[in-house]
Amino acid sequence: MNTNPVFIVDDDTDDQDFVRECWKELGYTNPLLFFKSGEELINELMTHKTVPFLILCDVNIPRMGGFGLKAKLLEEESLKHKSVPFIFWSTQASNEQIKKAYDLSAHGFFIKGNTMKELKESLSEIMNYWQKSKQPQS
């Protein structure tokens, strides 16, 4: 089982706290690393050798936004082939946003939910899927 950290790009500190609580209740052992902007995530990926298990990204993040971040990651040759699932994870989504996410080669688009129960279900579905999915080793 992949024990690499899960990177979460979300500037909402309340959501970060809720995720930490749900993560603990679900019993996952992967470390969580939070980033408040796309620039913070890119800096981490470019300067450190840690390869995340997956990246969960809110659509509405400061400056470049989630879609801008995904587009930037596609431009970076050093990041393009790391086989890291990039999943949009937001409180709501229009059909246009979902289409845009997949146009940018996102690996999924999930709704966080409005309650702790829904948030836990969403995290559980994402983690269960990606723990079972086979990925090339980079």
Where are these regions (language model features)?
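CheY-like receiver
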Residues: 123-124, 128-138
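Conserved acidic segment of CheY-like receiver
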Residues: 4-14, 19-23, 55, 87
